[in-house]
């Protein structure tokens, strides 16, 4: 059954004019249904030029002398070049580039005092000062034994090591 709308005053043009702003007109330049799909960027356009690279912030004053001499050479080789003629300082780096992979490699000596301080500093950043105190108390005996080269037992709670190849035939 078809719907019929009866108009009270009989003038259909006036009723259409009152609702006309709610409909799109045919004479508008912008046609929503016939728009072309968005074009991808041209292959020659360099997308990285659109992003701004912010400079690396300076480290806090407490981080100034944490790099050992072998690590310093690696850090300088990874450092961005300053084109203004200013010299580069290792203190400008907030952290050694490469993270733990570089620190654990042959480049950085794990027995170096500055390397151990760097580990303690990172531990303080993530776990608080109580964890760093535990780390210092654990590292001190090990470093003393390494430097002396003696075979003194380090702690009572450490189990004795068993030989890897046990040839017991019982």
From Swiss-Prot:
Highly expressed in epididymis. Also expressed in hypothalamus, pituitary, uterus and ovary. Low expression in testis. Not detected in heart. Its main location: nucleus. The modification Phosphoserine is found at residues 60, 68. The keyword Transit peptide does not apply. It comes from the Eukaryota. It is found in: Nucleus. Seems to act as an inhibitor of cellular proliferation. One of its GO terms (molecular function) is molecular adaptor activity. GO terms for cellular component: nucleus; spindle. Rapidly degraded via the ubiquitin-proteasome pathway. Pfam families: Myc_N. This is Protein B-Myc. Keywords: Nucleus, Phosphoprotein. Changing residue 60 to A: Loss of phosphorylation. PANTHER family: MYC PROTO-ONCOGENE. The lineage of its organism: Eukaryota, Metazoa, Chordata, Craniata, Vertebrata.
């Amino acid at each position: 059954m078809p719907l019929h709308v009866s108009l009270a005053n009989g003038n259909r043009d006036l009723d259409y004019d009152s609702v006309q702003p709610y409909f799109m007109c045919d004479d508008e330049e912008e046609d929503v249904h016939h728009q072309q799909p968005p074009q991808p960027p041209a292959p020659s356009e360099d997308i990285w030029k659109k992003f701004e690279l912010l400079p690396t912030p300076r480290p806090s004053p407490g981080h100034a002398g944490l790099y050992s001499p072998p690590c310093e050479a690696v850090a300088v080789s990874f450092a961005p070049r300053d084109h203004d003629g200013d010299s580069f300082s290792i203190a400008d780096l907030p952290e050694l580039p490469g993270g733990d992979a570089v620190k654990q490699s042959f480049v950085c000596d794990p027995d170096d005092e500055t390397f151990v301080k760097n580990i303690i500093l990172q531990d303080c950043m993530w776990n608080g000062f109580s964890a760093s105190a535990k780390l210092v108390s654990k590292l001190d005996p090990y470093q003393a034994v390494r430097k002396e080269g003696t075979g003194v037992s380090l702690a009572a709670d450490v189990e004795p090591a068993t030989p890897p190849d046990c040839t017991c035939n019982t």
